[in-house]
Curated annotation (Swiss-Prot):
Gene3D superfamilies: Bira Bifunctional Protein, Domain 2, GAD-like domain, Nucleic acid-binding proteins. Its main location: cytoplasm. The keyword Kinase does not apply. This is Aspartate--tRNA(Asp/Asn) ligase. Aspartyl-tRNA synthetase with relaxed tRNA specificity since it is able to aspartylate not only its cognate tRNA(Asp) but also tRNA(Asn). Reaction proceeds in two steps: L-aspartate is first activated by ATP to form Asp-AMP and then transferred to the acceptor end of tRNA(Asp/Asn). PANTHER family: ASPARTATE--TRNA LIGASE, MITOCHONDRIAL (PTHR22594:SF5), ASPARTYL/LYSYL-TRNA SYNTHETASE (PTHR22594). It is found in: Cytoplasm. It comes from the Bacteria. Keywords: Aminoacyl-tRNA synthetase, ATP-binding, Cytoplasm, Ligase, Nucleotide-binding, Protein biosynthesis. One of its GO terms (cellular component) is cytoplasm. NCBIfam families: aspS_bact, PRK00476.1. Its EC number is 6.1.1.23.
Amino acid sequence: MRTHYCGELRKEHIGETVTFYGWVDRRRDHGGVVFLDLRDRSGIVQIVSDPQRTPDSYEQANALRNEYVVEITGRVTQRPEESLNTRIPTGEVEIYADKIKLLNAVGKQLPFQVSVADTETVREDLRLKYRYLDLRRERMAQNLQLRHQIVKAMRRYLEDLEGFIEVETPILTRSTPEGARDYVLPSRVNPGEWYALPQSPQLFKQLLMVSGLDRYYQIARCFRDEDLRADRQPEFTQLDMEMSFMSQEEIIELNESLVCHIFKTVKGIELQRPFLRLTYAEGMERYGSDKPDTRYGLELVDVSDIVKDSGFKVFRDTVTNGGIVKILPIPNGNDVISNVRIKPGGDLFKEASEAGAKGLAYIRVRDDGEIDTIGAIKDNLSEEQKQEILRRTGAKAGHLLLFGAGEAATVNKTLDRLRQAIAREFNLIDPDKINLLWITDFPMFEWNADEKRLEALHHPFTAPHPDDLSDLKTARAQAYDLVLNGVEVGGGSLRIYQREIQQQVFEAIGLSPEEAQSKFGFLLEAFEYGTPPHGGIAYGLDRLVMLLAGEESIRDVIAFPKTQQARCLLTDAPSSVDAKQLKELHVASTYKPKS
């Protein structure tokens, strides 16, 4: 029977006889004495098998190899001074093995080394194919334990301190337009009809508020059939919350307290409150982003009014046609960023063009503090315009000023990407710094140029600002996003709870009354039976864990993730199914594999 986990043993256990289980992380033979590093999820402890002191275990220890599974019983002893290991928590003790029992051996060559001591970089496809081995590695085991600690902290705070109730909502539901494609499943017992996997529990949690539950939360599984990247998966996990009778301010305050509790409990970090707040307009104006990383400066400066009457046609025409001209000021940029990098073929030009920009204009500030204009800008800015640009940007000797000109969305996207790239190159990002901020006052709608219609910026159940009800199409939403170091980790809003306003929003996004009734009739009817004011928020758990773990991809904080092609390399899903299954579901595939 196990008495301890490997990583638990300390000086206070010296003299005790202990039993534990684990995997052989490493085996070493020093002058006839066998040393084993035994590993389990808690860490590593050193085992000693000396033929003089523990002859009964020596033969077994000598036969062990990496990743063999064993049971060991022995005595905890003090390590000699010269072999103390301060790098691990158990480094002051070692176990003299009295009994070693082999539980299972390794029958094949390992596809990669699992040992803590091994520093090789393993290809991600191998790690995903043999995920059960990858999860034995110290880093991955720690990531999953961190994830567990975060979820536990969330649950304890919400239940014990705020009175929330955890409720599960359906996984099999109906398809509703929420922004991304749904994953759909055919119904065998209802031929020709389909379920959808939920993109979020949005409508059900609102219905729980109609039910009078008052405060709900759920660790919810969500599914979206969208293009993937490092911080997206087809299935993901949210901390989902909904509250009745609370203002936006009260919801924000509660969630700041929740986040502070998580950081304090899990990382021992005291966060400063209140968190910074920016409106959507301020975020776009200063950073070109609604999720800015504020750990560094490099704020954008709008100079549209300065250059609107300049001799530079590109700037003049841009402003005349309703566009903007903004500058990304880069201190000491002259010394590092060459003209070649900004012109076609250069890395910064490529970064800008991928964001939709057609080109980059720039000026340099000489060592004497004067502007050194080049190319098409030369002689097309008056001295007064040059001096006003210097004043507004605060540019000094050595500054490089990168211009973006065009539609506001393209300019902001371009300069946001360049801002991030420059910050990385100039090492302006402090990895230990934690900057949290709220973005508020989002627009209710954005224009979908492909479909020639308005669509909800968040979702169509977000409540408009009460001051903007006279013109919903230009209204601000009562929405709020929480941003951590440039990554959106949470987003929520006050909800519409009156049928008339909900119908107006459906109409604004192009849903006819008949379509609205067909898709959301159950919600509209619920609003007839005394719906309370309510609002909520959802946190991307995978992203939050990724950031707290210091990882670059959410795949490294999910036990069994998919690739960027939405495949599981471990189980080879998705896969084909046999004709009998398809027949039972009344489904036929029209896909023809390429020859």
